[in-house]
Amino acid sequence: MELIEILQALNACHGPSGSEGAVAGVLRTLAAPYVDSCTTDALGNLICHKKGSGPKVLFAAHMDSIGLMVTYIDEKGFLRFGPVGGLSAHEVLGTPVRFANGTRGVVALEGKVEPKDMKLEHLYLDIGARNEAEARTMVQVGDIAVYDTPAFCSGGRIFSPYLDDR
């Protein structure tokens, strides 16, 4: 499997903090041909072991991703959210997102806010719902969205929102 295909498979996983199981599953499958065993501990850590008498090496990386947790659904069907991890209003505005159930949306800005004054509370998720009732058939308060941005190559470089460790 090519590196870009591996990154695309990992990007496709829904893995916000506390829900990294899908990511661990993909990593387990990817690692299986190269290791003797893969186990998951009580905290959800994936531990892959390659037997041998040579020097020991540890590769450590997080599997979770930044998330946006739905905190309120308004009468227009827009979703207010809180951060799961470090979020900046300036960085997340306009970002496509997806929920575990496949619902997709985008981070939008309410009204006219000066860039210097923009905060997370000025943002909302637009999932295309016409009203609150329709939105509630798509997502619930407490559901978490992650970035819905694919890995891709351009100019000999690889781009992905999950290149920090995952």
What are these regions (language model features)?
Residues 1-166:
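N-terminal hydrophobic/helix-forming segments and targeting peptides
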